Amino acid sequence: IRTGGCPPKDPVMETLEGETKKVLGYTCDIFTDHTLEFIQSNKDKPFLVSLHFRAPHSAWLPVRPEDWEPFKDLDPEIPNPDFPNLNVELVKKRTREYLAAVKSVDRNVGRVLDALDTLNLTDNTIVVFTSDHGYNLGEHGTWFKGNAKRILKTNPPKRWEDIPADRRPNLWDTSLRVPTAIRWP
């Protein structure tokens, strides 16, 4: 399965035979389904799986109803609510959507771990969970990673010729910190 920048639902994917086709369903679930099929087919021999979820990259919605439900009415606490000109309502909306996408990833990682348990592979399998970058969730008036977008009611004047006014390149800890968890037998 090779794809990138795909939507959270009904992605166009390339098959192992090199054909592209639209696959109906939620992308996280589809990737996990393929992973579970591979694990089941290879459970009796050594294997390596590299499962790359596209979430929680935007767009975050749609997600399965059970992933959205805990967050749909949430009034999230945001890190810098007093940042000058911050669009607080937009930060809260995006935070709810982001958390729902994270919940989808969490649920699907759980499906993989449950399959390893069910197939008695847990004691012989190393699982590494990591990300490709951190994320700004309103900190410093920004949203996204190191090439963050401003999340202000109005953008400041453009300061650099080659950087759009709505962008804020950064090396803040929130962009750089990469989550990692390892489950070792």
How does the language model describe each region?
Residues 1-185:
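Active-site-proximal cap/lid insertion segments
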